């Protein structure tokens, strides 16, 4: 069949795999189930899982122990990549697949296959918000990539470290790592990136760097690199990477305060992710559509949709961006004057903010929202100032200039009530003048108007 129908071998390896399975020819059957799984992943992750599980069923039929271990290792790694897309990046089944793959590497001395298994485990820990473990794995990946002097592995290792640093709120260091990853990316290596990590770093890294740039105070650069990520995703024709680009683009627009852009793009993002059954990104897009609805005055619908997305996300085991989602919920509640609800959601995050192993990229904004809640609900100026001051300390430590600007705006509102407007505007003016772009974004427009009232 391989010789008679070469086009089927290439385009539909599952047919060949089925024939070899029926003929009880285990080794070639497994080889073709693996090919079928890897090919299907670019179109349908669910189909990929089915093909790979068929291959795993045949593993006991291989007599040679080294070949048996290597075959299972390749299948388990690909299965982990496929399950990430269908079940969510941080489900237990994903961890089991990568852990088994790594165990087989170590038992059989197959060191050359260690990198993708460890990258998979880094992903699992990262999405679980276990950043101490994620950071250690990212450092291991970088050391391994340097020792191998492998450019593809270096791209992915810098990605892993950059993503982890971002989540920890170390934005300048994250940007350095992400820029390094982007600079090493080669279009000619696109297939190799997908084989190793089941995602396209040309898309994913740019998307994360866009968020990082916004926090660092470069909202226009953030939008530009986000557009680059979308172009890379369109060119790759890889659905999972397109889902990443679509949903993180929504997040960048949200950070820039562009409600209409989020509302206008969210439906298409949700439909695309639902079509391909990318549960993690469906949840993310629902959260952002809910935020947009709340901003547009549909408070009850918006809050309910953010909660729905958050529940879907947590059901996959993911805790990454949990503080961000709760922050969006609290923001919607504050605007709806539901201050008790806002404090309830913020309380879920507040207890974790002092732990260096937890998510801290949104810590300054959480403190600002706590201050806003006390300022608006009870005019408790002392408590509001306490949280605004804590937020400013964090924002300055993290070099999160965009969040520092928001906190200074909140401080201006506080000082207006205390009849100390000049002090608040002086502080705001210093931050405002440090920006070199983004003057048409909501926060900077508001800052300019506040300063002009002086």
Where are these regions (language model features)?
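Extended alpha-helical scaffolding segments used for macromolecular assembly and cargo binding
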Residues: 1-117, 124, 383-394, 398, ...
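Eukaryotic tandem repeat interaction scaffolds
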Residues: 306, 326-334, 338-362
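Structural signature of tandem alpha-helical TPR/SEL1-like repeats
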Residues: 95-99, 133-140, 264, 380-386
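Tandem amphipathic alpha-helical repeat scaffolds
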Residues: 18, 35-41, 74-88, 113-133, ...
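C-terminal non-catalytic interaction modules
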Residues: 93, 100-103, 344, 353-454
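Amphipathic alpha-helical segments of tetratricopeptide repeats
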Residues: 2, 37-38, 56-64, 99-110, ...
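Residue signature of alpha-solenoid helical repeat architecture, marking inter-repeat boundaries
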Residues: 7, 14, 27, 43, ...
């Amino acid at each position: 069949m391989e010789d008679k129908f070469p086009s089927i071998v290439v385009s539909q390896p599952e047919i060949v795999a089925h024939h070899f399975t029926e003929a009880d020819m285990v080794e070639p059957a497994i080889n073709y189930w693996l090919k079928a799984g890897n090919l299907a992943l670019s179109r349908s992750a669910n189909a990929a899982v089915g093909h790979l599980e068929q291959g795993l069923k045949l593993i006991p039929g291989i007599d040679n122990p080294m070949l048996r271990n290597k075959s299972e290792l390749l299948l388990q790694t690909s299965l982990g990549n496929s399950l990430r897309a269908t079940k969510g990046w941080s489900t237990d089944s994903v961890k089991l697949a990568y852990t088994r793959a790594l165990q087989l590497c170590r038992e059989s001395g197959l060191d050359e296959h260690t990198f993708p298994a460890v990258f998979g485990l880094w992903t699992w820990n990262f999405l679980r918000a276990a950043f101490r473990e994620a950071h250690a794995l990212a450092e291991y990946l970088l050391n391994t990539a340097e020792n191998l002097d492998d450019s593809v592995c270096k791209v992915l290792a810098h990605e892993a470290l950059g993503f982890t640093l971002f989540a920890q709120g170390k934005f300048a260091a994250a940007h350095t790592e992400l820029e390094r990853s982007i600079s090493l990316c080669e279009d000619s290596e696109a297939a190799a990136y997908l084989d190793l990590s089941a995602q396209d770093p040309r898309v994913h890294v740019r998307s994360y760097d866009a968020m990082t740039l916004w926090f660092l105070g470069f909202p226009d650069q953030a939008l530009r690199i986000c557009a680059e990520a979308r172009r890379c995703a369109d060119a790759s024709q890889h659905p999972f990477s397109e889902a990443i680009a679509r949903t993180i683009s929504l997040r960048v627009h949200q950070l820039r305060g562009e409600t209409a852009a989020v509302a206008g793009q969210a439906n298409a993002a949700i439909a695309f992710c639902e079509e391909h059954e990318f549960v993690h990104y469906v949840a993310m897009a629902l959260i952002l559509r809910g935020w947009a609805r709340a901003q547009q005055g549909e408070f009850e619908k918006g809050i309910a949709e953010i909660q729905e997305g958050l529940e879907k996300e947590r059901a996959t085991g993911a805790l990454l961006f949990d503080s961000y989602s709760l922050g969006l919920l609290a923001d919607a509640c504050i605007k709806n004057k539901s201050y008790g609800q806002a404090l309830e959601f913020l309380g879920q995050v507040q207890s974790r903010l002092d732990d260096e192993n937890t998510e801290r990229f949104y810590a300054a904004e959480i403190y600002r929202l706590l201050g806003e809640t006390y300022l608006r609900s009870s005019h408790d100026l002392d408590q509001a100032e306490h949280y605004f001051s804590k937020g400013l300390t964090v924002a300055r430590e993290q070099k999160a200039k965009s969040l520092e600007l928001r906190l200074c705006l909140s401080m201006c509102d506080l000082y207006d009530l205390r009849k100390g407007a000049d002090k608040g505007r002086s502080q705001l003016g210093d931050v405002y003048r440090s920006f070199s772009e983004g003057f048409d974004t909501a926060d900077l427009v508001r800052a300019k108007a506040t300063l002009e009232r002086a």
